[in-house]
């Protein structure tokens, strides 16, 4: 109940007041039932809202994200927790095993686990940054289907900003690494990390061109008014109390 009400309020603010516009394609590629892992390109703080906008209300989405970047004010923490669960990552905190355990708990309950393999906002507009293998390690150990999710237009925000997203057909680690025989390497081994890196490179090769295709759809003319550009772009990215501790 609170989740639906919070999402309705967020939709009103983002799409009614600020007038963000999102063009989403490929919803037919979402698995019809059961859990899955979303591997999404990362452009800005609006990205989780773009993902939630594209997904059905149920099952609920859980995000692996930066704790210091999110919990910068009590109201932000409440908003994020109400809209979708957050599994926070802290500097010098737990390793991949703990994140895999959390991801297993999420998918084990039939929910959606979302991770952005870039790990941070990086790369120029319209291009993805380097991908890290953590998401594919989680996919490998949980067996969750992987839904590639491309988006563009969230790196710079202003009133009426156009954005675009595209959901690609679901795949698996074996689908990304065609010559893998399907025998899982020992957890924590070099072989497992190498396999995850190969799957990560394959996912980046899929998402990169789609992000480049979507980017022109979000570009406004140079003389287009960009009201509140600085405030909106940095709305959720300002340093907070946890960054200073």
Regions found by a protein language model. Give the residues of each.
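C-terminal non-catalytic accessory extensions
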Residues: 242-245
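Soluble catalytic domains of membrane acyltransferases
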Residues: 20-194
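A contiguous, mid-protein "functional segment" used to position or interact
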Residues: 182-219
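Short, amphipathic alpha-helical "lid/cap" segments that border enzyme active or binding sites
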Residues: 6, 10, 100, 104, ...
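Short, highly charged C-terminal tails/helix-capping segments
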Residues: 214-240
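Short hydrophobic helices that act as membrane-entry/anchoring signals
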Residues: 3-18, 77, 81, 85, ...
């Amino acid at each position: 109940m609170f989740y639906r009400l919070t999402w309705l309020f967020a939709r009103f603010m983002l799409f009614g007041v600020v007038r963000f516009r999102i063009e989403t394609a490929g919803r037919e590629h979402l698995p019809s039932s059961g859990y899955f892992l979303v591997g999404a390109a990362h452009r800005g703080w609006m990205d989780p809202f773009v993902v939630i906008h594209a997904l059905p209300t149920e099952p609920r989405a859980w995000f692996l994200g930066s704790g210091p970047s999110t919990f910068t004010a009590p109201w932000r923490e409440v908003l994020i927790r109400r809209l979708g669960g957050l599994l926070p990552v802290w500097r010098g905190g737990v390793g991949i095993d703990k994140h895999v355990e959390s991801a297993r708990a999420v998918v084990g309950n039939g929910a959606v686990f979302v991770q952005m393999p870039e790990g941070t906002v990086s790369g120029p507009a319209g291009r993805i940054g380097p991908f890290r293998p953590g998401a594919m390690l989680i996919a490998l150990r949980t067996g969750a289907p992987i839904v590639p999710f491309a988006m563009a237009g969230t790196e710079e925000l202003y009133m009426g900003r156009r954005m675009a997203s595209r959901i690609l057909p679901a795949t698996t680690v074996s689908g990304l690494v065609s010559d893998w025989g399907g025998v899982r390497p020992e957890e924590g081994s070099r072989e497992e990390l190498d396999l995850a890196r190969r799957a990560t490179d394959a996912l980046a090769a899929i998402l990169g061109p789609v992000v480049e295709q979507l980017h022109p759809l979000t570009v406004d003319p140079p003389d287009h008014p960009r009201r509140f550009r600085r405030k909106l772009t940095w709305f959720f990215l300002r340093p907070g109390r946890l960054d200073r501790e």
